[in-house]
């Protein structure tokens, strides 16, 4: 428990009593150090005897000169690891999130890796094998603890996206023009729907509204439930639209094609017009 206390309640075995007599014990003794060990010597400190049963009177006994020992056992810890989905069942000690029962403000780390029973997103996934997962000294000593159980919380992998289109006069960013990135391994997903950018005009934008885009299962084991678009970086580029111009004029003995003669402009968006 990270202290040198030897509580009377822990010193439950009383030896060298007469017959069936018993005594009770109160107070706290002291150990030389806080660490795990067998039959560690207890200094009496405030430990005191009190009358018990079957005729046991404290006045007939003394703790002075006796042998007083306490065994300090390793405290079992339950560890929780946490990481994003990565398409593997690897549970690395380096992804340690928390322990449940560290004492006295102590901390420990973990090394090695185990194998989880599932690779998919969930909380509290058990280990198929602890592998070589091990406790490592922090401000506390690993030797004072034992690893009882380990689980891993696997969260959704955050996707990024990028895309582009030719200027079309609207703020739509179609999923068909968007490429997803940060997928695990060789997995793929299918995206559909329409996102929204902040302006219809040519430029580079961060997609401001992804609520219209959804992801669905893809290939090579890609499950939409293991991924999220929320929190990712989503960029979209609107490129210039190429237009054509045409027209006619009378022969004038020059090679000039005056803007005023090129009166037909094609491939403009909607009812938009330009001057030349």
For each predicted feature, which ranges?
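Short loop/turn motifs that initiate or flank beta-strands
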Residues: 2-276
């Amino acid at each position: 428990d990270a202290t040198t206390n030897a509580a009377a309640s822990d010193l439950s075995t009383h030896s060298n009593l007469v017959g069936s007599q018993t005594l009770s014990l109160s107070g706290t003794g002291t150990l030389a150090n806080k660490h795990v060990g067998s039959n560690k010597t207890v200094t009496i400190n405030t430990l005191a005897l009190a009358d018990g049963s079957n005729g046991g009177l404290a006045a007939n006994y003394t703790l002075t000169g006796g042998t007083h020992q306490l065994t300090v056992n390793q405290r079992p810890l339950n560890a929780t690891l946490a990481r994003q989905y990565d398409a593997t069942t690897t549970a690395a000690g380096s992804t340690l999130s928390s322990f449940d029962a560290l004492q006295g403000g102590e901390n420990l780390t973990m090394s090695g890796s185990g194998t989880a029973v599932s690779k998919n997103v969930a909380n509290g996934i058990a280990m198929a094998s602890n592998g070589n997962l091990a406790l490592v000294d922090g401000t506390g000593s690993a030797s004072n603890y034992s690893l009882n159980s380990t689980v891993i919380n696997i969260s959704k992998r955050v996707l990024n996206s990028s895309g582009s289109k030719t200027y079309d006069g609207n703020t739509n960013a179609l999923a068909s023009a968007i490429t997803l990135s940060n997928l695990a391994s060789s997995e793929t997903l299918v995206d559909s729907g329409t996102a929204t950018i902040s302006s219809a005009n040519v430029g580079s934008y961060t997609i401001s509204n992804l609520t219209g885009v959804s992801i669905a299962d893809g290939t090579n084991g890609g499950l939409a439930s293991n991924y999220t678009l929320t929190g990712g970086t989503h960029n979209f580029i609107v490129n210039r639209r190429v237009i054509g111009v045409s027209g006619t004029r009378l022969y004038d003995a020059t090679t000039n094609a005056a803007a005023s003669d090129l009166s037909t402009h094609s491939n403009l968006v909607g009812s938009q017009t330009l001057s030349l």
